[in-house]
Structures are given as C-alpha cells and as structure tokens.
C-alpha cells in the first residue's frame, strides 16, 4: 500500500519531498497574511474538503497555492491574496534571513518561533546555541567573557582597581566582549545560508546592530529586528514565567536585573543608531503583526527587484 492509502491523507508534492496536507499549516499561512484565525481555519477546511471531493490524492505545492490564491480572490480577500502570493514568490526565489535581537527576557525566542511558523521558515537558531559551539573552539583563557552570561561577562574583564570595576561602562564593555566571538558564528551562518539559498531565523541577545558586520545592514534579504520592554514590571514577570517552565534560575536574573536593563538600553540605542526597527514586545500577537508588516515591506522591495514572472508561483 502507498503512504497516502495508509494514512488516508492528501499528499502535497514539492521538488524534493512529499508531505501530508495540513489544515494547521495552511491556517497559519493565511493568518500571517492578515486573515482572522477563525476565517483562516474555515477556508483551510473548505480547501481540504474540495480536494477530497475531487478525489485528489496528490497535489503539487504550486497548484495548492494557486487554489488558495483564487479562493481568497473569490471571497473578496484581494489584499490578503496579494500578500499571500508575495510571500510565496519571495520565499521561493530568495533566501530570507531574519535576525531577532534583544536583551535577556524580552521574548526573542517566542517571537522568532511565531514568525517561523507564520512564514514557513523551517529553521530557528538561538544565539545561545552558537555561543556553546564557540566555547568549544575558543579557550576560556583566551576569551573568558565568552564563558559568562551576557550580564555577568564584565566580571571576567581585567581591571586596574575596584573603583573602575562595577560600573555601567564595564558592564557594557563586558557585554561587547561576550558578544564579539558569538557574532563570528552568527555571521558564518548568515553567509552559508545565503550561499546555499536557505532561509533561517536567528534570535538572541548577541544580535546587536553596530557590532554585527556592516554589510548585513544593507542586504535586502537580511532583516534585523530588535525587541524591547520598557516596563520593568513586565520584564521581571517574563523571567518569573520563564522560571516556571524551565530550569533557569529566577534569582540569578532578578539579582542582575539592573545590568540586564542597561544592556537592553544599549541594544535599543545601537538599533536606533543603525536604523533597525525597535518593537515593544508587550503583546505577542501585536509584536508578531508588527514584525510581519516590516518583513512584508522588505518582501515588496525584493519582489520588485526580481525579474517578471509569467507564472503565479
């Protein structure tokens, strides 16, 4: 028996693979394009029913997208249809690199995974993971700041006197020295993704405009976003919530909160100096929507740069 006979699923075919049709994936794509979640699910369910009624067991990804596009047009969702079409065109022709930066606790990982889900980008990499890899290749004696957290790296700095030690300037210098070797790994992933034509989202506190290589700021398909939290109360609540679902020590964050706040202000300052969007991440849904608007604007520019395509997809 074939896979589709065993699973009783409609298979969606791409060039290199086949996967079962998913209402959930289609719903997320439609929601990302601006459709209400409930309406997105209804349309996804209707499309699945139409395919089943027609007795289709396999459908190409291009044909499925074509059907979704015209289903939106027929329901007077022209703007959503064009946005849905735009994203598919751009993601098919270009590798897209999205960098989501921000201090500890502002929610970069949550937003990164939400964006990946909405845009259909399969890879999300946290910069903490890159830091761990860099630790294996750079000795502690050479760069001791790398072996500290972003907010305790200053303790590994050499200092001439105690008076010069525990200051904002030293906190930020330690943070910069902590970030610099991690950026080597981040930039390597960006370069390789661009070379291999793969889309990826990187997230974490090590993504700092101004420290990141200047060439990436001018690349159309590298999109840099910065998240922040101006409210100390909300920021601290995020650490409390994180501690409930992970083994990260709450007291360590709270006891270093003033330094984390300094780092947050520093990253925001560097972002504004380098014309990187700064987004208040109070509401996850609103933040995701703002990020998608920024990404869509960049997609429009990329699409205009591409050669005219006679096909819909």
Swiss-Prot record:
Pathway: Thermoadapter biosynthesis; cyclic 2,3-diphosphoglycerate biosynthesis; cyclic 2,3-diphosphoglycerate from 2-phospho-D-glycerate: step 1/2. Its EC number is 2.7.2.16. It catalyses: (2R)-2-phosphoglycerate + ATP = (2R)-2,3-bisphosphoglycerate + ADP + H(+). Its cofactor is a divalent metal cation. One of its GO terms (molecular function) is kinase activity. Residues 8-95 form the ATP-cone domain. Keywords: ATP-binding, Kinase, Nucleotide-binding, Transferase. It is an enzyme of class 2 (transferase). Transmembrane segments: none annotated. Catalyzes the phosphorylation of 2-phosphoglycerate to 2,3-diphosphoglycerate. Involved in the biosynthesis of cyclic 2,3-bisphosphoglycerate, a thermoprotectant. Belongs to the 2-phosphoglycerate kinase family. This is 2-phosphoglycerate kinase.
């Amino acid at each position: 028996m074939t896979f589709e006979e065993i699973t009783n699923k409609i298979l969606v075919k791409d060039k290199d693979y086949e996967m079962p049709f998913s209402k959930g994936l289609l719903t997320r794509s439609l929601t990302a394009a601006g459709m209400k979640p409930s309406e997105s699910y209804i349309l996804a369910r209707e499309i699945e029913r139409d395919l089943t009624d027609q007795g289709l067991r396999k459908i190409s990804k291009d044909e499925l997208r074509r059907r979704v596009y015209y289903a939106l047009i027929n329901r007077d969702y022209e703007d959503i249809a064009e946005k849905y079409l735009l994203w598919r065109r751009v993601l098919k022709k270009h590798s897209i690199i999205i960098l989501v930066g921000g201090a500890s606790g502002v929610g970069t990982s949550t937003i990164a995974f939400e964006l990946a889900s909405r845009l259909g980008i399969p890879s999300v990499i946290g910069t903490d993971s890159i830091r761990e890899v860099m630790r294996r290749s750079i000795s502690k004696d050479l760069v001791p700041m790398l072996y500290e957290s972003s907010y305790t790296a200053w303790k590994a700095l050499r200092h001439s006197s105690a008076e010069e030690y525990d200051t904002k300037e030293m906190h930020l210098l330690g943070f910069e020295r902590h970030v610099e070797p991690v950026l080597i790994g981040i930039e390597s992933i960006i370069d390789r993704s661009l070379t291999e034509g793969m889309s990826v989202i990187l997230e974490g506190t090590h993504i700092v405009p101004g420290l990141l290589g200047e060439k990436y700021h001018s690349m159309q398909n590298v999109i840099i976003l910065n998240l922040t939290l101006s409210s100390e109360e909300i920021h601290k609540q995020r650490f409390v919530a994180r501690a409930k679902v992970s083994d990260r020590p709450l007291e360590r964050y709270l006891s270093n909160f003033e330094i984390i706040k300094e780092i947050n202000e520093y990253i925001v300052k560097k972002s504004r100096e380098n014309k990187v969007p700064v987004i208040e991440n109070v509401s996850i849904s609103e933040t995701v929507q703002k990020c998608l608007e920024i990404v869509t604007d960049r997609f429009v520019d990329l699409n205009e740069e591409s050669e005219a395509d006679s096909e819909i997809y």
